[in-house]
């Protein structure tokens, strides 16, 4: 905030005499602001306009990052304090609003037959992961397996909702078919044989691997899977971190 020119507090104070007690402002800010820095912005706004309505908006185009962060003040604010906007490639806009809730990772074994969903990390950044979960997993139980990094993951007993407001914040989702202890060139045969035995004809890496190694390992997996012969049922699959190992999933 100190690097902003002009300083935000000075800028808003200069404009305050020309604005009503209930202003209509949109502050376009850096998406890299920390929670502490966002609180600083709120304190600046409160020092000038008191307890005015405010809504934080995170905007993403679905590449696993926050593209724009803005604070909507006064008449522009939503009825909820947090809002996540997803802009799809086809021009569709999905909105998720609510209050910030803290999510917790719950341990436990990874069971075959359950569903694993990798979500957009912007859900966590916006504090709306729980709001999304309440809509995504209405039936049966669900718990967060991971909440950090580029691939936050949810485990659920039933497939998640197919509504756009849910799916637009999903990277990939599938049913857990099997688990393996390691994903590497050394365990390539074990991995592909397990995937083939589970009925998967194609397997994509959705786990953290050295960027220099990932394309080579993916190509090796593709070649190995083709050796099992054509599959009339094209069942796409993926493998991702799960607990202390990895889960092979059939993509939904």
What are these regions (language model features)?
Residues 1-252:
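SAM-dependent transferase fold signal centered on methyltransferase-like domains
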């Amino acid at each position: 905030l100190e690097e902003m020119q002009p300083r935000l507090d000075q800028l808003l104070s200069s404009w305050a005499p020309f604005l009503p007690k209930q202003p209509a402002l949109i502050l376009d800010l850096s998406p890299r602001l920390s929670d502490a820095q966002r609180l600083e912005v709120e304190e600046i706004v409160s020092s000038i306009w008191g307890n005015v309505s405010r809504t934080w908006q995170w905007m993403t185009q679905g590449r696993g990052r926050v593209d724009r962060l803005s604070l909507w003040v006064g008449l522009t604010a939503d009825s909820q304090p947090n809002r996540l906007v997803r802009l799809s490639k086809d021009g569709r806009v999905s909105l998720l609003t609510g209050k910030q809730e803290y999510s917790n990772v719950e341990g436990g074994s990874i069971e075959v037959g359950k569903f694993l969903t990798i979500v957009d990390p912007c859900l966590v950044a916006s504090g709306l992961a729980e709001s999304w979960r309440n809509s995504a997993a209405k039936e049966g139980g669900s718990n967060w397996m991971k909440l950090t990094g580029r691939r936050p993951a949810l485990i659920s007993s039933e497939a998640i909702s197919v509504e756009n407001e849910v799916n637009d914040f999903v990277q990939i989702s599938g049913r857990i078919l099997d688990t393996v202890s390691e994903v590497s060139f050394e365990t390539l045969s074990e991995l592909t044989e397990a995937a083939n035995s589970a009925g998967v004809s194609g397997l994509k890496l959705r786990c953290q691997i050295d960027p220099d190694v990932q394309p080579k390992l993916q190509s090796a997996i593709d070649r190995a899977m083709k050796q099992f012969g054509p599959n009339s049922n094209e069942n796409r699959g993926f493998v991702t971190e799960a607990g202390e190992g990895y889960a092979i999933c059939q993509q939904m």
